[in-house]
C-alpha cells in the first residue's frame, strides 16, 4: 500500500473534454468522482493501456492530483505513450474517486470497471492492457476479467491468499516486486504468481534486488519492464510494430518465468 495502513483486502456516460479528462459518477456512499486522463494515440487507436495507482486500506478521502499515489504513475504513462502512441497505443490514467480499498466496497475496482466501460464504448474490440502499482496492482488483477483485457502488469502489488486468480485466466501477466518492500508482500506476490500460472496465458515474475515499494530505486528497471511487457503484448495482438526497448529482451527473455535483477 502507499500509506501505512494495512489489512487483507476483501476481495454515466460523459464525453471527454478538451483537456482529456472525464469525470465518473461517485462511488456509492459518497459524492467524490473518479477522473480519467487520456493520452490519445496518433491516428487510429489499436490498443489502450489503463494505468491504476495505489492507495490505502480504508479511506473515504477523495484522491487529488497532488497525492503521490497518482503522481507516481505519470512517468509510466508518459513513457508508454512516447513509445507506443505513434503506433496506435492510447494511454488512459485513472484517478480513483477515493483513496481507500474499503473492504467489500472495493472502491478502486468499481472505478476501474467504470473506466473500462468508457474505454470499450469509445474503442470497442481493441485490446486493453492494465498497469497497476500497489493497490492498483490488486485492482488490475481483479479487473482483468474484462473481455477486452489481454495483459496485466502488477508492480509491487497488494496481494494476499484471498486474492482470486480467476481474473487473470487467459491473460499475459507480469508481476514485479522488490526485495526490501516493507509495505506489500513479495512472498504473497510470488505465491499468487504460482497459483495464477495454472490458468494465465503466461506468467512472469521479476524480483528486483534492493528495490522498495515506491519504485524510487531502480526506477528505470521498473519502467523498462512495464513498458517492454505492454508493448510486446500490444505488438503480438495488433502487429503494430511499436518499438520495444532493446534492453527489454535482455531484462526479461520471452522464455523466462522467474527472473532476479
Where are the model-predicted features located?
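Alpha/beta-hydrolase active-site loop
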Residues: 102-122
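A conserved short beta-strand
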Residues: 148-159
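Short beta-strand/loop motif that positions the catalytic acidic residue
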Residues: 168-169, 174-181
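Short beta-strand immediately N-terminal to the catalytic nucleophile in serine-hydrolase-like folds
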Residues: 130-132, 155, 176
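Short alpha-helix in the alpha/beta-hydrolase fold that links the catalytic acid
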Residues: 64, 185-195
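Gly/Ala-rich beta-loop-alpha elbow adjacent to hydrolase catalytic centers
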Residues: 131-136, 140
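C-terminal catalytic histidine-bearing segment of alpha/beta-hydrolase fold enzymes
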Residues: 17, 26, 197, 202-261
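Short, surface-exposed "cap/lid" segments of acyl-processing enzymes
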Residues: 14, 20-86
Amino acid at each position: 500500500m502507499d500509506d501505512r495502513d494495512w489489512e487483507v483486502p476483501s476481495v454515466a456516460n460523459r464525453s471527454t473534454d478538451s483537456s482529456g479528462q472525464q469525470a465518473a459518477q461517485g462511488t456509492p456512499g459518497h459524492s467524490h468522482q473518479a477522473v480519467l486522463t487520456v493520452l490519445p494515440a496518433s491516428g487510429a487507436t489499436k490498443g489502450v493501456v489503463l494505468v491504476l495507482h495505489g492507495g490505502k486500506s480504508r479511506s473515504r478521502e477523495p484522491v487529488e492530483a497532488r497525492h503521490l499515489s497518482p503522481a507516481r504513475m505519470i512517468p509510466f504513462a508518459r513513457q508508454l505513450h512516447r513509445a507506443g502512441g505513434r503506433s496506435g497505443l492510447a494511454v488512459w490514467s485513472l484517478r480513483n474517486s477515493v483513496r481507500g480499498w474499503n473492504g467489500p466496497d472495493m472502491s478502486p475496482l468499481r472505478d476501474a470497471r467504470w473506466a473500462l466501460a468508457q474505454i470499450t464504448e469509445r474503442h470497442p474490440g481493441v485490446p486493453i492492457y492494465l498497469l497497476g502499482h500497489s493497490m492498483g496492482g490488486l485492482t488490475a488483477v481483479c479487473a482483468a476479467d474484462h473481455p477486452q483485457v489481454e495483459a496485466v502488469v502488477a508492480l509491487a502489488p497488494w496481494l494476499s491468499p484471498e486474492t482470486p486468480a480467476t481474473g487473470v485466466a487467459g491473460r499475459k501477466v507480469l508481476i514485479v516486486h522488490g526485495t526490501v518492500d516493507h509495505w506489500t508482500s513479495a512472498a504473497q506476490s510470488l505465491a499468487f504468481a504460482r497459483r495464477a500460472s495454472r490458468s494465465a496465458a503466461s506468467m512472469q515474475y521479476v524480483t528486483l534486488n534492493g528495490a522498495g515499494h515506491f519504485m524510487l530505486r531502480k526506477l528505470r528497471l521498473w519502467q523498462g519492464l512495464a513498458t517492454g511487457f505492454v508493448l510486446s503484448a500490444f505488438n503480438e495482438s495488433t502487429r503494430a510494430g511499436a518499438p520495444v526497448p532493446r534492453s527489454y529482451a535482455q531484462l526479461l527473455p520471452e522464455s523466462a518465468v522467474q527472473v532476479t535483477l
